């Protein structure tokens, strides 16, 4: 499912609309009805920069799972320091109390004096995960949107949202959150020396395993080729490549045993994640795009998540020359984490 309808402002789900979904029977038909009814899930919000900057033969691109983008000032300082031409972002809130009921990507774009593209991954029916439910008990979301997108001073052309799945697996609350929507890849084109290049900012499902990640990858690549056939591509995302099926992770000792057999498994998951073989067959590479020795996870100030950590965020390229890949610590001026994911950055040029 590819959404190409654009708007200057998404239609925000009202408190009453979200409450009505919460009170409906927890069955598939309720999910489908809710998914179809929330207009915010079926459009892409776009604001162009006032004076778009023309890119030359090279561009510095960064990807970050910003974990709600809730630390506004610290996140802006971190991202300004990257001097990136385009920021590819996921886990962005719009109207969530956990991030101050702000429009986080618009606020970031305002701070940077740039344009943005935003698409909604989920309509959140609650306050967030168990930590957030406890921290913000008794408060309310103003809109309840969570998604991904881009920020850039350059023109972001032909924006689109690809819905990687609409299973409704978050609808019944089995993962301690109730949500309407599904994982997404946000697409937009930039121009390097007037040549079109497609960027994809991606967030894969965190509660499945390698087999489902393969399916999401196939869907994503097919939609990329349908949207922008024959042009160079850079994909950045949180791919959650933890190398285990959800059922395996639930069995005590399974992860520890697998790491004892292969201590590099989480840092170099290629042999355990068939999505890498598919990407290779479809012409994508990753070694030149990534700092291959650096994990991309870190512990938040509340002590979660805990090691062992690995590389779950990746950049993949096709038809591009990648150089100077970096993994940048997602911390504030005191060294405290502002996300549980590090920032990835790379310089791209036409191959």
Feature roles, as predicted:
Residues 3, 24-47, 93-194:
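Structured beta-strand-rich core segments of catalytic domains in phosphoester-bond hydrolases
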Residues 179, 197-204, 263:
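Active-site-proximal loop/helix segment associated with metal-binding centers of metalloenzymes
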Residues 33-66, 76-86, 115:
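Eukaryote-specific, low-hydrophobicity, charge-rich regions
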Residues 70-71, 100, 143, 179-182, ...:
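Soluble or luminal CAZymes and related metallo-dependent hydrolases
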Residues 1-46, 161, 210, 224-234, ...:
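Metal-dependent phosphoester-hydrolase catalytic domains
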Residues 60-65, 75-101, 117-121, 151, ...:
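Active-site beta-strand/loop signature of hydrolases that rely on acidic residues for catalysis
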Residues 14-23, 50-72, 94-97, 130, ...:
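Acidic/histidine-rich helix-loop elements
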